[in-house]
Amino acid sequence: MIDPKQLRSLVKRTLKRIPHGHSDSSEIAVLMLSAHESRLGKYLKQTQGPALGMGQIEPITHDDTWKHGYSCAANAKLLRIDRDVERLEYDLVYQIFMIRQRLFMKSELLPPANDLWAIAEYLKKHWNTVHGKATAD
């Protein structure tokens, strides 16, 4: 598991480099996803599946984000990030970048940072889908 304070610092610094990427809500959302999906980086590869990284992003989702994310290529260029699905397993900045880019694709805005339950429900709806095993709890 990655030290939560160090991870939060890296998340904040990375999100601030992405145009419109940082807010207290987005910082919390990335950390919540990382805690839930990979236990803060304990699992960087799904034990029985294709998902990779702290956000457990599947290669098909990665590729869809690059193809359909309106700001993905432009933001990657600004951050000098090259597209490479394998980086999801070992590059924390790339993982944070991809989580944020995926969240940018949702038309519904992130809830306020002071409403953790609403952020958890938002992530359940937009990250795991209502049909997945995860709950907002």
Model-identified regions with their sequence ranges:
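Peptidoglycan-targeting cell-wall enzymes and recognition modules
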Residues: 1-15, 21, 32-108
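A broad structural signal for alpha-helix termini and local helix breaks/kinks
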Residues: 18-19, 127
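GGW-centered surface loops in extracellular recognition modules
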Residues: 24-25
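Acidic helix/loop microenvironments that form the catalytic cleft of cell-wall polysaccharide enzymes
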Residues: 34-38, 102, 110-135
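Short beta-strand->loop
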Residues: 55, 136-137
